[in-house]
């Protein structure tokens, strides 16, 4: 049995990689880029720095900086209009997962038209949009190396998973120095998101030897460095490990898919505006406990790769240590419960069935080692609400 592996054509990795943008554009034959980003990147001066580098190389750029933290079909519309009305030959995505996801959608809609819901899973979007160069500024989503984008349909409060080669960046510039200014909360949420990607890719029913290698190495990089990056924002070694780990985790899940945590996380984010990484963190311990009986050896491998279990530990002991570590990470990194985040219990329980249906419809739960029924997902939402 063969497995299809999809990657960016070109990746620059390491300190200062973002400074290679002009050269990369030239190598790709692009000279009229639209920079897609958010207001924070403008305020931090990152956009001016990159635009200045391009100008020095004789490349004129424009900027769309109105992406939202959890992008909606409406929030990207102005960017799509800019592409349709302009003469751009490429898109540069600068920021965390949300600007990169927005840029992916803008590149496809700007070239082919239609509505975002037209491209939702299970459609396989193989059409090539505008060439996309991704420059991540968080160590989390791995979106710079994935063939997915997540956009919320604000008319139904559904986070739509869109997948296909058309959403894969042609190039990624992975510069950990851009993460040195991240606040602890963002570091924690994006870091746990990356760890979730690695774990879910490894236990996915679509996993392969290739994705396994990326996922295990991602866990080896992420787990020992997450606390250091959270507690010591200027720790360059920890930041570098987190950035590379997040990208490897992105490569892993882009080729093996994510599973139940992500399937259940998207409705929480859509209905209650919980940041994606944070909703994953809320779910990860409970979903892992639910899933371990169906793939105990795979989860034990995760515990060993993360450095919390020894090679000599039994599978059962390793999995106990894995669950203890996931709970400890949430506690030490101050991950709130749904109630502590501010979600009303009545509303959460009222939406359980709708969230369960949306989770199943996304397709991600079908990749889980233990594939849940709708009733089991409803029960798991209750478990997450009631957990200490």
Q: What spans do the regions from the language model cover?
A:
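An N-terminal, well-structured beta->alpha segment
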Residues: 1-64, 387
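N-terminal small/polar loop signature for handling phosphorylated ligands or for N-terminal nucleophile
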Residues: 42-117, 227-239
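Short, surface-exposed alpha-helical segments at coil->helix boundaries
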Residues: 43-51, 296, 323, 353
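Glycine/threonine-rich beta-strand-loop-alpha-helix active-site module
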Residues: 74-177
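Carboxylate- and glycine-rich phosphate/diphosphate-binding segment that chelates Mg2+/Mn2+
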Residues: 148-256, 375
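C-terminal catalytic subdomain
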Residues: 256-324
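C-terminal charged capping/lid subdomain of soluble metabolic enzymes
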Residues: 299, 303, 309-388
């Amino acid at each position: 049995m063969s497995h299809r592996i999809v990657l960016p054509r070109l990746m620059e990795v390491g300190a200062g990689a973002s400074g290679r943008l002009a050269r990369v554009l030239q190598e790709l034959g692009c000279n009229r880029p639209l920079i897609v980003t958010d207001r924070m990147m403008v305020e931090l001066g990152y956009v001016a720095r990159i635009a200045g580098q391009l100008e020095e190389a004789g490349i004129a750029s424009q900027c769309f900086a109105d992406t939202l933290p959890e992008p909606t079909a409406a929030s990207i519309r102005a960017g799509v209009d800019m592409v349709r009305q302009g003469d751009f030959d490429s898109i540069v995505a600068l920021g965390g997962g949300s600007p990169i996801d927005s840029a992916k959608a803008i590149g496809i809609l700007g070239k082919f038209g239609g509505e975002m819901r037209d491209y939702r899973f299970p459609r396989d979007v193989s059409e090539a949009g505008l060439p996309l160069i991704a420059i991540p500024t968080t160590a989390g989503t791995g979106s710079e190396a994935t063939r997915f984008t997540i956009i919320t349909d604000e008319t139904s409060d559904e986070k739509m998973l869109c997948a296909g080669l058309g959403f894969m960046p042609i190039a990624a510039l992975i510069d950990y120095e851009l993460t040195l200014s991240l606040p602890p909360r963002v570091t924690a949420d994006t870091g746990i998101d990356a760890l979730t990607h690695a774990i879910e890719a490894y236990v996915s029913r679509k996993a392969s030897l290739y994705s396994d290698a990326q996922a295990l190495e991602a866990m080896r990089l992420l787990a020992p460095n997450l606390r250091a990056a959270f507690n010591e924002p200027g720790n360059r070694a920890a930041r570098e490990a987190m950035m590379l780990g997040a990208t490897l985790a992105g490569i892993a899940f882009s080729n093996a898919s994510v599973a139940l945590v992500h399937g259940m996380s998207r409705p929480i984010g859509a209905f209650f505006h919980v940041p994606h990484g944070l909703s994953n963190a809320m779910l990860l311990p409970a979903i892992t406990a639910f899933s371990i009986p169906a793939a105990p050896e795979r989860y034990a491998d995760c515990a060993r790769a993360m450095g919390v279990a020894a090679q000599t530990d039994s599978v059962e002991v390793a999995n106990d240590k894995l669950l203890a570590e996931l709970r400890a990470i949430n506690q030490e990194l101050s991950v709130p419960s749904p109630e502590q985040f501010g979600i009303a219990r009545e509303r959460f329980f009222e939406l359980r069935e709708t969230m369960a249906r949306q989770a199943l419809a996304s397709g991600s739960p079908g990749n889980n080692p233990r594939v849940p029924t709708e009733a089991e997902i409803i029960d798991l939402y209750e478990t997450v609400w009631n957990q200490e």
